[in-house]
């Protein structure tokens, strides 16, 4: 939930980002969410835009850092 508000993500984008942080590849994420790999790729493109990053690794790192900061502050 904190990722939703911290980065203005949709619920589905937050789910995709969660699985990226867990180290899953697009095909795995698609299977988990019952979506196509192309849909997962599109969600990742939107996530990258909202976070201002270019790679899934950068997106994952930013998400982990934000969650840690939120846990420390509250």
Regions found by a protein language model. Give the residues of each.
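Helix-turn-helix DNA-binding segment
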Residues: 1-42, 50, 64-74
